[in-house]
Amino acid sequence: KNIYIDYLEKFKNSKINAVGLSFVQNKDLIIYLKKKFSKFLMISKIENSEGLKNADEICKFSDAIMIDRGDLSAEIGDNNLYDAILKISNLTKKYGKPLIMATENLETMSKSNNPSKNDIISLGFSSQINSDVIMLSEETATSTKWKNIIIWLNNFLISRNKKLPQQYDDRIFWETVNLVKDYTLVVFTKKGLMLDKIFKKSNTNDVFVFTDTKKTKSISNFYKNAKCFVTGKINNKNLSKYYYDNI
């Protein structure tokens, strides 16, 4: 914990908006750091046995979750990796949080102009479990083919999104803060406190978020199906007039 505090103190006045927490064991570190450094979004990496055991509470209190398949596999064994990924992804979406899939997503493209079949299947699996972000590491950090890799991945993700089925239900209702799934949603929010509940219901359909705070925009940017716009100060007392005057 002290290591994180030392580093975050140095960067608290920077333009950094999110922090990755490695080898998170339980919720305690997350809660402490979120209170002390409320400016930052806390992205927890679940990558060992203890973190996997406490994955439910880690997903609940984090702003986003990253699955580091390399470290996780080394910690729990290759044979347990698949089930662990399913568990973490299900819990992440249970709490409506963004899911980041990391490690060797397009490793073969570091030396080749095209991905392997295994790369493509892996990316398809990540899409099926509703990963919001595909994270590249060595593919772009050390490879001379980094530009080609980014272009290929961008085109692949665009084509995948176009193929995702849009489902619609004749019923739409509010029940406290829960929204019915499968509709394009427009949300006005200051602190983004409802976003996790919204994304429990909307994994594939577009969600347009309007906010007057940078932190809400930062967390919205992690969701694959969210488009966020920073507005002038939102007046909750007369939101409809604000919309027609400013949008």
Q: For each predicted feature, which ranges?
A:
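Non-catalytic helical/linker scaffolds that mediate oligomerization, partner binding
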Residues: 1-247
